[in-house]
């Protein structure tokens, strides 16, 4: 034992040095690991600086539109009908009632209802679509097949496919009275289909076989339209995207053979990318459903569930009558909220046009609205703005030079002295737009 102790005592200095060396290595490794962990945390999860950057980015980009906030010097883009005006409504109590949580296991199958003609249509969405039309009274839904599409654009394409004869000797002519919706020509001819082709202004068409697209109220000018052509070999598709009480008087329940609607212009949820069709003929509905099946193997069930929840919140909002003496409370009544917005915006736009003196707008179109049970004017979601100033033959370019982006009349089959302006952007963007317009002379 003494020998062992003598041995340990004799080598104590070397042992301590070795132990210290090992501790130094361990400490160095630990420090490097800590430094690496800190770097990785900053790199992938963000530190204080990264958090500050994220907060700054969140402050600079609007949460729902992805567009930066506008300033007095901003370019105001009113080319698209981006319905961000509705965000204020959905930030309130109605938005909470429209919130939906989709569990990870839900909506995994392709199929919604295998026994249905439109097997990818969620039953809940069909139910809420029918409820909404009964509430508003803008279309007959009973006795019609309900189809769902990725926006009404896909349903428009499905209708063209369904209405074109198989193996035609020449493509079916597709027409619409000018000014027509600017996407009709582009979408019709995009795939260069042998089944159908764009044939222009319905008022100039001289033929017997055709599909006439009837957009009413009209995009771009808000006018009420009926089919122009009456040939027995022709058929009309009615695009009723804007036939809602915030935009126009609901004078009767439409009952056409094919009627197209879209969530975006009804509720403001353009990003949900959903539309629906009411189709009277079963064979046509089957062909339209087949087109969507082959085109996209159905329609997002997640979007359908969300849309169903949104439509339910709208209809339920009218089941809850405002408290006594609170008739101006529109927090649950979407159409009343949007109507007030449109009335206010059109009044400001007409005042700006009058102040400028170089622009004109279509006359107001009043009518008895069965939904509101009173006579009201139309307040379309787009303004058809014409310029009478000498030398301004390209109004789109004239406005662009003044940092206002619009859509020129040529895209609608009209002349260059007129443009389409969206009335549905944010309050801030709209306010800057009317201020600039009023200053032009």
From Swiss-Prot:
Transmembrane segments: none annotated. Pfam families: Alliinase_C. It catalyses: L-tryptophan + 2-oxoglutarate = indole-3-pyruvate + L-glutamate. InterPro entries: Alliinase_C, Alliinase_N_sf, Ethylene_sulfur-biosynth, PyrdxlP-dep_Trfase, PyrdxlP-dep_Trfase_major, PyrdxlP-dep_Trfase_small. Keywords: Aminotransferase, Auxin biosynthesis, Pyridoxal phosphate, Transferase. Its cofactor is pyridoxal 5'-phosphate. It is an enzyme of class 2 (transferase). The keyword Transferase applies. Pathway: Plant hormone metabolism; auxin biosynthesis. The keyword Isomerase does not apply. The modification N6-(pyridoxal phosphate)lysine is found at residue 265. Its EC number is 2.6.1.27. Highly expressed in anthers. Expressed at low levels in ovaries. One of its GO terms (molecular function) is carbon-sulfur lyase activity. One of its GO terms (biological process) is auxin biosynthetic process. Pyridoxal 5'-phosphate binds at residues 110, 152-153, 219, 239-242, 262-265, 273. Probable tryptophan aminotransferase that may be involved in the regulation of auxin production in developing rice grains. Belongs to the alliinase family. PANTHER family: BIFUNCTIONAL ASPARTATE AMINOTRANSFERASE AND GLUTAMATE/ASPARTATE-PREPHENATE AMINOTRANSFERASE-RELATED, TRYPTOPHAN AMINOTRANSFERASE-RELATED PROTEIN 2. This is Tryptophan aminotransferase-related protein 1. It comes from Oryza sativa subsp. japonica. The lineage of its organism: Eukaryota, Viridiplantae, Streptophyta, Embryophyta, Tracheophyta. The gene is TAR1.
